[in-house]
């Protein structure tokens, strides 16, 4: 993996532990005391010659963040990393809101925030000497191609029948939609950037359709944590959900809508526009069906069957800073087209069209030849086409 990251220019923070001495929801590392030094040595010696590795991480969301009598463990790990590789800094993923102030942050070279965009401003003011970044951000949840109505901007809504609406507005209690993290990063340039949870969906951790007590670690002890645990208990363990909804890309490698809000924000020079949702809603004729557009442009005009639905410009609010929204579009079969502009000039377009009845299947392999060794693979994308293709 690191060889690929070297070639592709992907920046890696090489993380060693998820648990130190203290157990995390019943899972512990009984061999930590005996093996932690050897583990640090082995990791450093294996990876220190990879240019993609920009820092070492000693842990992620460890309970010791909140235990002053155990902060020495973090300092020990930092010292070991420095001994084996004096060229790189050491960080840790911190989800304890107090860890930056209770002394734990002093044991790290670089502070990693998990899901605390609201804390960036004060951190930069209180600790100007210490670099920081978003070690885990967003945790927005969605299912590719699923949209539920009415569209509610409350991040705790949008869940139905083991799916999550793909308007990219929804997240667990500790998490946020991408727009919130984007704003925090831009408004606090002291932050080095963000690592999003997650790039791809994965098997397990099907939040919000599971009782995962580790979620409670993302909020402080007290009423807030008690409220979250009550919400999780109410949701329960709702099989058949078995994989995550966090990914920007789904389990098959297909891009979700959310891919395009990141593309628009991270690649401002790329001419792009993306419309959501799809435009096949026979049961919604005449009903309000909001349209969202992600674009690297700064304004756009939306057309439905050639009729303008109005111009939207990016602003400074949460609803219009990173997406353009037409709240009152009434569904009519046909074609949606968006024309995005930048600096007053046409920048990019996108269209979605109501499809007809299925007429054919097309198969597109990602390669036409594979080795006959029983191991090589070709992934085939199957598309259902109407008579117009």
Predicted regions and their residues:
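Short, solvent-exposed loop/linker segments at the N-terminal edge
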Residues: 281-286, 369-378
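Generic structural detector for well-ordered beta-strands
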Residues: 325-330, 351-353, 364
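Edge beta-strands of extracellular beta-sandwich domains
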Residues: 344-356
């Amino acid at each position: 993996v690191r060889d690929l990251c070297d070639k592709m220019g992907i920046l890696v923070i090489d993380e060693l532990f998820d648990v130190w001495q203290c157990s995390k929801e019943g899972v512990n590392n009984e061999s930590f005391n005996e093996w932690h030094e050897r583990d640090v040595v082995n990791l450093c010696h294996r990876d220190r010659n990879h240019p993609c590795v920009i820092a070492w991480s000693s842990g992620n969301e460890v309970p010791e963040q909140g235990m002053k009598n155990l902060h020495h463990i973090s300092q020990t790990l930092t010292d070991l990393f420095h001994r084996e590789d004096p060229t790189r800094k050491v960080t840790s993923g911190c989800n304890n809101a107090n860890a930056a102030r209770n002394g734990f942050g002093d044991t790290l070279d670089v502070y990693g925030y998990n899901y605390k965009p609201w804390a960036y401003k004060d951190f930069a003011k209180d600790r100007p000497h210490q670099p920081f970044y978003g070690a885990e951000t967003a945790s927005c949840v969605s299912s590719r191609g699923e949209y539920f109505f009415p569209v509610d901007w409350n991040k705790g809504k949008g869940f139905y029948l083991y799916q999550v609406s793909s308007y990219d507005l929804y997240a667990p209690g500790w998490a946020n939609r991408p727009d919130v993290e984007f704003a925090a990063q831009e408004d606090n340039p002291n932050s080095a950037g963000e690592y999003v949870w997650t790039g791809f969906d994965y098997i397990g951790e099907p939040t919000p359709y599971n009782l995962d007590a580790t979620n409670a670690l993302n909020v402080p002890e007290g009423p807030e944590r008690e409220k979250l645990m009550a919400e999780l208990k109410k949701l329960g363990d709702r099989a058949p959900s078995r994989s995550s909804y966090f990914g920007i890309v789904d389990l098959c490698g297909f891009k979700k809508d959310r891919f395009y809000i990141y593309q628009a924000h991270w690649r401002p020079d790329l001419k792009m526009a993306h419309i959501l949702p799809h435009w096949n809603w026979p049961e919604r004729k005449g009903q309000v069906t909001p349209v969202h557009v992600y674009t690297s442009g700064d304004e756009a005009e939306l057309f439905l069957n050639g009729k303008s639905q109005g111009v939207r410009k990016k602003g400074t609010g949460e609803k219009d800073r990173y997406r353009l929204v037409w709240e009152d579009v009434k569904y009519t079969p046909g074609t949606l087209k968006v024309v995005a502009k930048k600096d007053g000039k046409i920048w990019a377009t996108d269209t979605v069209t109501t499809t007809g009845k299925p007429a054919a299947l097309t198969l597109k392999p990602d390669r036409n030849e594979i080795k006959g060794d029983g191991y090589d693979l070709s992934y085939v994308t199957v598309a259902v086409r109407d008579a117009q293709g």
